[in-house]
Amino acid sequence: ESINITPIQLIKIRKLFDAVGVPCQPKEELNRMPALLAKLREQASKAGGPAPAPETPKLTVIEAIEAQSGNAQLLELFNRHDEVLALSQGWTKTAAEIAKRMPAWHKLGDLLRHAKALGPYAKLKAEAEAIEAQRSLLADPDPVRPLLDETVDLLRQALKAKLDAFQQGFAQQQALLQQDADWNKLGNTQRDELTAKHHLTPPPAVATGTPEQLQDALDDCDLDHWVSKTQALPSRFEAARHAAVQLLKPNVVHVAIPKRTLNDEAELKAWLAEVETLIRTKLESGPVSL
């Protein structure tokens, strides 16, 4: 070829290879060029991406080098040494910053999905959407971390309220069951078996100290599910009480009292008469449990 690369130029080119992260021995410069260009493309691809990350950098310099071949390509690389080195270092730094901040962004999105029914959700969601629209993941100061902290605090308080309500309801139902005469007639083994069968063991503590623990807790049982579990407590304990009666009196008949909205004395008397008739009829067949 008419283009000659001097030993001094080759030394500088090999140093650039090393700086980019592609080892290169003497006389391997042309053979290692595809690996160098692939490495640069990889670095560029990690320096951007889907919002809220910055846009993927343009590859104008890489494409200019790729457009050449042979010694002309080496010369192009040599002439662009400082530019390529700066781009490589900049892309690597940006990629590291993206990798550092992106987990918090993903965690924010995951947690916001659990906050849809909470009052501040619209504000938090709007702020997250602004970060995404403006691709401001790497802005200084960090816009994601404070938003994540606010979302975590909101959800932690909401979950605590649901847990407190569940634990209070559990304690109330447990106290009522322990006062029940039929339940107390059972042996310890029978009570233990019914407790296990009807899932009446006290709920374990729920760890929410870190965003990851909070996420796991909500994924396992979200806010709405805690409400449902609390509402289901009376029926669970009542089922255990009925089972206790069944063990003591196998022929017992369970009677469901009809539910009504009573507006006056006359309706009350009519309802009481209806309930009395229902119970008396069932008593003819054996013991009755209400």
Model-derived segments and their meaning:
Residues 1-289:
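Extended alpha-helical interaction scaffolds
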